[in-house]
Amino acid sequence: MGCNSLSMIKVRLQNLFDNDEVALLKITCYTDKLILLTNALAKAAIHTIKLNGIVFIHVITSSEVCPDNNIVVKSNFTTMPILQNGGYIWELIELTHCSQLNGLMDDNCEIKFSKRLSDSVMTNYMNQISDLLGLDLNS
């Protein structure tokens, strides 16, 4: 029982912004409750925003199935409980090493978790998320 397995979950991202780019988002973590984590991601809403030429991704999960510290034993991301409906926005993710010479996204692209953004950049980012979701995140 208590044995945790290393699991990689892949989520295909299509139509990033206004083009036909396709990428594969890879989420790797140690968990002993992979079914719950998979279900949470299957029901997640994924939004992308381009900021200063970098593509950032928010994976938004329902509060009912959102992984917490009891599910995600070891990972490179945290949850940010800022949605008014009680859901969670997962930490910023930056796609790297994804561009091919033909301009399309590489299916084998890597992800890295972003460093903390400056307050001004974060404010700009959150305003874009707020507009995208129709939420007032400042209230």
UniProtKB/Swiss-Prot annotation:
A motif (DLNP) lies at residues 136-139. One of its GO terms (biological process) is symbiont-mediated suppression of host cytoplasmic pattern recognition receptor signaling pathway via inhibition of MAVS activity. Disulfide bonds: none annotated. InterPro entries: Pneumo_NS1. The keyword Nucleotide-binding does not apply. GO terms for cellular component: host cell mitochondrion; host cell nucleus. Its main location: host cell. Keywords: Host cytoplasm, Host mitochondrion, Host nucleus, Host-virus interaction, Inhibition of host adaptive immune response by virus, Inhibition of host innate immune response by virus, Inhibition of host interferon signaling pathway by virus, Inhibition of host IRF3 by virus, Inhibition of host IRF7 by virus, Inhibition of host MAVS by virus, Inhibition of host RIG-I by virus, Inhibition of host RLR pathway by virus, Inhibition of host STAT2 by virus, Inhibition of host TBK1 by virus, Inhibition of host TLR pathway by virus, Interferon antiviral system evasion, Modulation of host cell apoptosis by virus, Viral immunoevasion. The keyword Kinase does not apply. It is found in: Host cytoplasm; Host mitochondrion; Host nucleus. N-terminus is important for IKBKE/IKK-epsilon reduction. The DNLP motif has IFN suppressive functions like binding to host MAP1B. Plays a major role in antagonizing the type I IFN-mediated antiviral response by degrading or inhibiting multiple cellular factors required for either IFN induction or response pathways. Acts cooperatively with NS2 to repress activation and nuclear translocation of host IFN-regulatory factor IRF3. Also disrupts the association of IRF3 with CREBBP. Interacts with host mitochondrial-associated membrane (MAM) MAVS and prevents the interaction with RIGI. Interacts with TRIM25 to suppress TRIM25-mediated RIGI ubiquitination and thereby RIGI-MAVS interaction. Belongs to the pneumovirus non-structural protein 1 family. Monomer. Homomultimer. Heteromultimer with NS2. Interacts with the matrix protein M. Interacts with host ELOC and CUL2; this interaction allows NS1 to form an active E3 ligase with ELOC and CUL2. Interacts with host IRF3; this interaction leads to the disrupted association of IRF3 with CREBBP and thus reduced binding of IRF3 to the IFN-beta promoter. Interacts with host MAVS; this interaction prevents MAVS binding to RIGI and inhibits signaling pathway leading to interferon production. Interacts with host MAP1B/microtubule-associated protein 1B. This is Non-structural protein 1. It comes from Human respiratory syncytial virus B (strain B1). The lineage of its organism: Viruses, Riboviria, Orthornavirae, Negarnaviricota, Haploviricotina. The gene is 1C.
